[in-house]
Structures are given as C-alpha cells and as structure tokens.
C-alpha cells in the first residue's frame, strides 16, 4: 500500500500529491514540511493543528495557509 499525502497552500502554485512507502515516512515528511512552514511564517505569527486526517498551518486574520491531507485514512 502506498501512503499518499496531498499538499495545498493559499497560492495553489505548489499543490501536489506525493506517495510514500510507509506511514512513518509520510508522517515524517508532513512534520518536516510543517517545520519549514513555521520558519517561513514565524514573522507573521501563525497557528497550526491537526484536524482529523489533515494537518494545517495558517496566519490568523491573513490569507496564508498550508495543509497536508493524509489520503489513506
């Protein structure tokens, strides 16, 4: 079984679906990308959380966001 993750952000330019061999690899990729987004959005202030099969990060009151959806759940 492949573990697919869908990434989306407010720009719609870099949206993608990626496949991983294991659930652990997929979860590690989500964590790594989330950390990158935290660094990028640090100066704007951000909030983030897990909602069911999605992990999201956003700027409260702003347009910036990114999400990672676990498609195997």
PLM regions and their residue ranges:
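Short aromatic-glycine-(Arg/Gly/Cys) micro-motifs in beta-strand/loop hairpins
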Residues: 1-16
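Short amphipathic alpha-helices within nucleic acid-binding modules
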Residues: 26-30
């Amino acid at each position: 079984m492949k573990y697919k993750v869908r990434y989306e952000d407010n720009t719609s330019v870099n949206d993608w679906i990626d496949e991983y061999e294991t659930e652990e690899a997929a979860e590690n990729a989500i964590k790594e990308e989330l950390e990158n987004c935290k660094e990028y959005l640090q100066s704007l202030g951000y909030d983030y959380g897990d909602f069911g099969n999605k992990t999201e990060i956003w700027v409260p009151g702003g347009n910036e966001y990114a999400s990672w959806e676990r498609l195997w759940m």
